[in-house]
Design a protein with these regions (language model features):
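S-adenosyl-L-methionine
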Residues: 1-154
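Hydrophobic alpha-helical segments that mediate membrane insertion or helix-helix packing
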Residues: 161, 171-172
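Domain-level detector for long C-terminal conserved domains
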Residues: 188-348
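Glycine-rich SAM-binding Motif I of class I
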Residues: 165-169
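Conserved class I S-adenosyl-L-methionine
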Residues: 153-163
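Conserved SAM-binding motif I beta-strand of class I
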Residues: 178-183
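Gly/Ala-rich phosphate-binding loop of Rossmann-like dinucleotide-binding domains
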Residues: 172-173, 193
Length: 348
């Protein structure tokens, strides 16, 4: 690991500008915390108040380049020895596909800073109030999606309208799931592919496992091969916060062939929370979806600091089947009054 000195910064510089020195310090901290046991950390690097990371931070703050470089070389020597002993590889191997969240976020931030950050302003070039408005779901909310849907390495995940692919990469790395992203807009789609390439190289350098990643540039309503992928999907994400009703209705038709138990995460619901099955709507896609609403809190999405809500709809055809079985058992008498039956589950 070799630092390079950034240009001198003034007080007016953008605070969000990539800082390689800060990145190096945070990378060292991440490696110490997640590639070694607590006992190894203390033995090899010292304590948090007096150890090597403290030295790096101190010399960075003092702008003492010579001592900073010496601390980096001390770290590199330790790493070379531990790598030769196989200690690092052994510890990382124990994670399998259950990587710590902080490690995942740091690696994704490194990928972003090397592929997107310098050109991020291009992402704002879209038609306002259209279906192609750009916005990203942030890692903390993606983490919640993963927990709610119980994603793991046996699952298939599809992000319809994936933007620059951040969620796809996080799911692949944090869970090991086979992960797909589809994006229609040229600029985000190009960034998604660049991120995927950098992600592959960086995870390989760190020795980390991840699920297969595929970024597709195309319209999710008309992408060859997507129907086959969706038929295998266990979790589908649709950031439909800015979609109009026509596009949401078109999306519903894609969901008709999803397998039983597939979960659809969306920022706007595709079906009313009090949807009732009756003779008129029993054949609709809405009637096979069992939906629940969840809150999200501050700093969970890129387009607002405020909280909001999201929905998880589960494909469940049992309510429709029960409706028709009931109708057949009484010769259709129960349909005379509309024969409605509430399809969503109530929280207890």
């Amino acid at each position: 690991m070799k630092p390079f000195l950034s240009r001198s910064k003034t007080e007016s510089d953008d605070k969000d500008e990539y800082n390689p020195i800060e990145d190096l310090v945070q990378t060292v901290k991440t490696i110490m915390e997640h590639f070694f046991t607590p006992e190894q950390y203390k033995e090899l690097f010292g304590t948090a108040s007096e150890g090597l990371h403290r030295s790096l931070t101190k010399y960075k703050n003092r702008k003492d380049g010579a001592q900073f470089l010496k601390a980096v070389e001390d770290f590199n020597q330790i790493m070379r020895k531990q790598k030769s002993l196989g200690a690092i590889q052994e510890h990382v191997r124990q994670y399998g596909h259950r990587l710590p969240y902080d490690l995942v976020v740091h690696l994704l931030q490194q990928v972003y800073s090397r592929t997107v950050a310098a050109r991020a302003s291009k992402l704002n070039q879209y038609e306002a109030f259209s279906n192609n408005v750009y916005g990203e779901i942030l890692p903390i909310l993606t983490k919640e999606f993963i927990q709610r849907t119980k994603m793991d390495e046996s699952k298939v995940f599809v992000d319809l309208g994936c933007g620059i692919g951040n969620v796809v990469l996080q799911v692949a790395l944090q869970t090991g799931a086979e992960s797909y992203g589809v994006e229609i807009m040229d600029t985000p789609a190009k960034f998604a592919k660049k991120q995927a390439r950098e992600f592959e190289a960086r995870t390989r350098a760190f020795g980390l496992n991840h699920g297969a990643v595929s970024m597709i540039h195309g319209d999710f309503l008309d992408t060859p091969g997507l129907a086959g992928i969706l038929a295998r999907a266990d979790v589908v994400l649709v950031n439909n916060y800015a979609f109009n009703s026509a596009l949401n209705q078109s999306l519903l038709q894609l969901f008709l062939d999803l397998k039983e138990g597939c979960k659809i995460i969306s920022l706007k619901t595709f079906v009313s929370l009090d949807h009732k099955i009756n003779v008129r709507n029993a054949g609709s896609v809405e009637s096979i979806l069992r939906v629940k609403k969840y809150p999200y809190y501050t700093n969970a999405v890129s387009w607002t600091h405020n909280g909001g809500e999201y929905f998880i709809a589960t494909v469940d055809r049992s309510a429709v089947q029960a409706f028709w079985e009931r109708a057949m058992s009484d010769g259709g008498a129960s349909l005379d009054d509309g024969g409605s039956r509430r399809s969503s589950t109530r929280r207890r």
